Amino acid sequence: MKKIKSLTALLLALSICAVTACSSQPADSSSATESASATESSTDSTTASGASSETSSKESSDTSTKPEKPVTDFTTYVSNTVVSTGNNFYIEKAENITYRAYLPVEQYGELEYKFFFTNTVDSTYTKGKIAFVGKSGGSYTISNATVADGGTGVEDEITNRTPVTFGGKETKEVAADESYWSDPVTMNIPEGHYMVWEWTVSGEGIPCNKMSSLTSTASSADGETFKFCDEIPLPQIIGAKRDVKHTVAAIGDSITQGCQTEQMKYEFWASKISTQLGSDVAFFNCGLGWARASDAASNENWLSRVSQYDTVIVAFGTNDIVSGKYGGKKSSAEEIDEYLDAIVSYLTEKGCDVILFNAPPQDFKKTNEGVRTALNEKIPAIAEKYGAKFFDFSALLSTEDEPGKAVYGGHPNGEGGTVVADAFVKQFGSLFE
């Protein structure tokens, strides 16, 4: 497995933009778990996992030798929402469509914000027919963009609309594969209120976030009559200049993103970890539905964003087992092990503390469960190899008698989110004090 190329001027010169319009394409609400169940042989029964519960307590050999992270907009304007806003889908065409999203913030009050955009797809969606890792976006126009106080929910009046500008202008022409930041904007979000992001875009081939129903998202052709939209272009980072003592990022699939948990309740494990750590720890959720470890291992653009954070949670495996690398077939345990090795190697070289999760239970049948079991036996060794930390995600979401059974669902529900968050903070909470 070839290691990811070193990041050079990318972090200082990134200027990508992502915009996507809700198209008429039918929503694909099927989950990775459902697909897995449909594709495996029905003649084989689920086998016990026996995944290793050993944790790697090995620290980096000398933390003083870690490379110092350069000061960039990524480190100055850190994430201020637990909602994942990356690109895992692609809107074919939008004509003056206005998109609106309600975003919960981690720290309330008056803060200076900047927003980062990338006009490239981060990860593969299902088999990659429409969107795949590294797919280039087309050109599009931003007519206007604003942030506002959304009140305590969608029934409240939206107030304090504030323009977001780009190079001093309210409009912007975005080129294919461009990446960029907005200008700074100061915004006050009162305690318990949502930030509302809204913009109007036109163009073709706009990367977007799909499975965005964790929060209220909508589109409008006239800027007034909004309807639910599950394919929505958003900034990839809702960045705020915050005085935090630690930064944490999580990169993974729909389980990290929080899919199939109750809308606007933020009960998924990543959100609950963020809540328990408190607002003086910035949490950046980079989970994307259908993402694979092979996507992250081949996409420095996506991986480089999380590498700006002090600690990075890496949580992949399910979709590599179910669907495999884009353009390929289902991945073997050995192949997934190589992808994870490349990811952890890259992140440790960038000075990140890495917490590596194993693959969670999915009620797989025999073939896929065998791959998951073999993979989970390998993962602690990756953590040990790089001085990373290991978290037995799988054991928390199953039982000792039935290690392959997803007790809280293939996409863990709120109860499962609490179990994971409690165990995570108990094991690693002192690292963030």
Summary of predicted features, one role per range:
Residues 1-10:
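Bacterial N-terminal signal peptides that target proteins for export
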Residues 341-351, 380:
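Surface-exposed amphipathic alpha-helices with a cationic face
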Residues 18-21:
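C-terminal motif of bacterial Sec signal peptides marking the signal peptidase cleavage site
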Residues 24-251, 256-257, 261-263:
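N-terminal secretory targeting modules
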Residues 360-433:
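Catalytic His-Asp segment of secreted/periplasmic serine-dependent ester chemistry enzymes
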Residues 279, 350, 385-386:
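Short, structured coil segments at secondary-structure junctions
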